[in-house]
UniProtKB/Swiss-Prot annotation:
Primary gene name: truB
Top-level taxonomy: Bacteria, Pseudomonadati, Pseudomonadota, Alphaproteobacteria, Hyphomicrobiales
Protein name per the record: tRNA pseudouridine synthase B
Active site: D49 (nucleophile)
Originating species: Rhizobium etli (strain ATCC 51251 / DSM 11541 / JCM 21823 / NBRC 15573 / CFN 42)
Family: Belongs to the pseudouridine synthase TruB family. Type 1 subfamily.
SUPFAM superfamilies with a match to the protein in the record: Pseudouridine synthase
């Protein structure tokens, strides 16, 4: 019987909060960082369109197991809407599908915003990663197929008009939940105002729980390639990583001993009784000696592991 293949790359674990430049795809960014860090695995926590810039959290190594906890977090975007044209992609890339000479006043824009705050029904753009009958909507759209994408509920926590540089554009900031399409907001604003609209600028500034000052520009990472000594270069890159546990900061935290850590790594539950144990049944994570050991469920006085870390 052949031995299982040893994964290629370094067994590192952590998050790099990339400040993604425009005209650089999210998948391309993940591949670049995986190569730079010589990591075994890499993945991002939410696609950022190539025309968008800003925060793209990228998980390396075992941190990829925590991606779902970041995907579910709140996000903040700054975006510019250009009035007068609706486009196939709802951004600058697409062909113009509708146009209007009408332009909204600043007060008219402010008047519609309250209707987009809270739980709203939103139809994703035709060019989106939504699956229709097993195929991505953007693949069907590129093939010229007009598909009906069902609406879905999304959460908008805050929506602010930051200003209007001129009659043709308006600048906004939105704090929203998982699955919200900012391009769809621009499209819907334009339709309601009777002037049509599309995204002409988009920047993500926050993905919970990571703050804007954690972002590292791609140019800073590329500059480290000039360090000839590989060990020195990797050490400089590793210094930019955020601890894997940061992605789990919204969950209850258990500090355990070495014996308990061993039990969890073997897939066995541990007792969590005592004054510091969480009372309510919930998901939680456990660390020993500052290292992440497992994510699991607390219930009936036990912590049962779901995901175990090396």
């Amino acid at each position: 019987m052949s031995k299982p293949r040893k994964p290629k790359g370094r067994p590192i674990s952590g998050w790099l909060i990339l400040d993604k430049p425009m005209d650089f795809g999210s998948t391309e960014a993940v591949s670049k960082l995986k190569w730079l860090y010589k990591a075994q695995k890499a993945g991002h926590a939410g696609t950022l369109d190539p025309l968008a810039s800003g925060m793209l959290p990228i998980a390396l190594g075992d941190a990829t197991k925590t991606v779902p906890y970041v995907m579910d977090g709140r996000k903040i975007y700054e975006f510019t809407v250009s009035w007068g044209e609706e486009r196939a992609t709802d951004d600058l890339e697409g062909d113009v599908t509708q146009s209007s000479e009408r332009r909204p006043t600043e007060q008219q824009i402010r008047d519609i915003l309250p209707r987009y705050i809270g739980t709203i029904s939103q139809v994703p753009p035709q060019f989106s990663a939504i699956k229709i009958a097993g195929e991505r909507a953007y693949d069907l759209a590129r093939d010229g197929e007009a598909v009906e994408i069902p609406s879905r509920e999304v959460e908008i926590f805050r929506l602010t008009l930051l200003g209007c540089r001129d009659a043709n554009t308006a600048h906004f900031e939105v704090e929203c939940g998982k699955g919200t399409y900012v391009r769809a907001l621009a499209r819907d604003f334009g339709r309601e105002l009777g002037c049509y609209g599309h995204i002409s600028g988009l920047r993500r500034t926050f993905v919970a729980p990571f703050s804007e000052d954690a972002m590292v520009p791609l140019a800073n990472l590329v500059a480290l390639e000039a360090i000839e000594d590989m060990d020195e270069r990797l050490a400089a890159l590793d210094a930019l990583l955020i601890d894997t546990c940061e992605a789990l900061s919204a969950l209850p935290h258990l500090v355990i001993n070495d014996d308990q850590a061993h039990r969890l790594k073997m897939g066995n539950p541990i007792l969590v009784r005592g004054r510091d144990a969480p009372i309510a049944e919930s998901e939680a994570y456990a660390t020993a000696r500052g290292r992440l050991i497992a994510i699991g469920e607390i219930g009936q006085g036990e912590f049962r592991p779901k995901r175990v870390f090396a």
